[in-house]
Structure formats: C-alpha cells, structure tokens
Swiss-Prot record:
InterPro entries: Flavin_Rdtase-like_dom, NADH-dep_flavin_reductase, RutF, Split_barrel_FMN-bd. Gene3D superfamilies: Electron Transport, Fmn-binding Protein, Chain A. Its EC number is 1.5.1.42. Keywords: Flavoprotein, FMN, NAD, Oxidoreductase. Signal peptide: none annotated. GO terms for molecular function: FMN binding; FMN reductase (NADH) activity; FMN reductase [NAD(P)H] activity; riboflavin reductase (NADPH) activity. PANTHER family: FLAVIN REDUCTASE, FMN REDUCTASE (NADH) RUTF. This is FMN reductase (NADH) RutF. Catalyzes the reduction of FMN to FMNH2 which is used to reduce pyrimidine by RutA via the Rut pathway. It comes from Pseudomonas syringae pv. syringae (strain B728a). One of its GO terms (biological process) is uracil catabolic process. It catalyses: FMNH2 + NAD(+) = FMN + NADH + 2 H(+). HAMAP family: RutF. Belongs to the non-flavoprotein flavin reductase family. RutF subfamily.
C-alpha cells in the first residue's frame, strides 16, 4: 500500500471570543477560595476559583493570578500563599476579597493567624493549604503559580461553597442515606 509523505493542510481555526469563553467557563462548578499572602511584599488577598491539584509528589497545586491585579506584586515578592477554601455562609467574605475594598478591609472581615509560611490562614476556612511558590508560568494575562503545599488544615463536616452559573451554591459535606 503506498504511503504519502505529504503533510495534511492545517486549516485556520477561528478564535473563540472572550465572551463565549467566559460564558462556557461559568458552566464549570468550582470551590471558592481566598488566596492570601504576607511578607516583605505586604499582606494581600483575593478571591479565586482558578485553583487545582497538580501532583501529590511533591504535593503541588496551582493558582492563577492576573498580572494586572493590585495584589500581584505582593504574591510574587512574598513567594508564599495560603489557599483558604470557603464554606457555606461565607459569600460575603468572598465578595469582600473579590471587590475593590482595601486589603485592610478585606482582612478585617475574618479571623486570621499566620501559617507555617507566614501566609494568613482563615480560622473558619473549610480547608487551608499553606504553600511556597515553586514556579511561575505566564499565559496570556495571567501567571500560573505552582505551589508546593507545606501544611494542611481542615474542618471536618464543614459544608462547601461553590461558584457555578455566576452564582454561589451550597454543597453539603455529607449526603443523607436514602
């Protein structure tokens, strides 16, 4: 059977619009997290759903941060962060960290203690993953921070807060038996 060494033509692919992409991403449910840092670059925090596991050897997760965000320099200079996963009833705190309020106002909304890395850990977080940033990769408008987890704190039985369809939703920690 004859073989062809010709390379198939690659047709141009139309770019997806920013609006279409955002609409599509609103269909992905995600945990709501406060990403916090403290150190020489200052104390800072923001709300994020762009967080996910990378590997368990070493335990590593990723966080995406916009390079134009007011908190960007603090995170890069400090090189540490804590992923504080929010529970049901903490929508106001999420909105506070996701809005235009000052860093002082944001942190006044909760009770905090310093984690192993010095990053602020929210006392009432469903889960807190204290991390050191091990690598950063730039893609488009954002940096992807790869973060090695050095300490974990969690509250068993705490209900989760998720964001889906541009709204907050309550996710019970346990499903009652049928």
């Amino acid at each position: 059977m004859p073989t062809s060494s010709a390379t198939p033509a690659i047709l141009p692919i139309a770019a997806v619009s920013q609006l279409a992409f955002r609409d599509a991403m609103s269909g992905l449910a995600a945990a709501v997290n406060l990403i916090t840092t403290d150190g020489p670059g200052g104390r800072a925090g923001f709300t994020a759903t762009a967080v996910c596991s990378v590997t368990d050897q070493p335990p590593t997760l990723l966080v995406c941060i916009n390079r134009s965000a007011s908190v960007y320099d603090a995170f890069i200079e400090n090189g540490t962060l804590c992923v504080n996963t929010l529970g049901n009833g903490q929508q106001d705190l999420s909105n506070l960290f996701g809005g235009k309020s000052s860093q002082q106002e944001r942190f006044a909304g909760g009770q905090w203690e310093a984690g192993v890395t010095g990053a602020p850990v929210l006392d009432s977080a469903k889960l807190a993953l204290d991390c050191k940033v091990s690598q950063s990769v730039s893609v488009g408008t954002h940096d992807i921070l790869f973060c090695e987890v050095v300490d974990i704190r969690h509250q068993s039985g705490a209900d989760a807060l998720v964001y889906f369809g541009r709204r907050y939703h309550h996710l019970p920690s346990e499903t009652p038996a049928a």
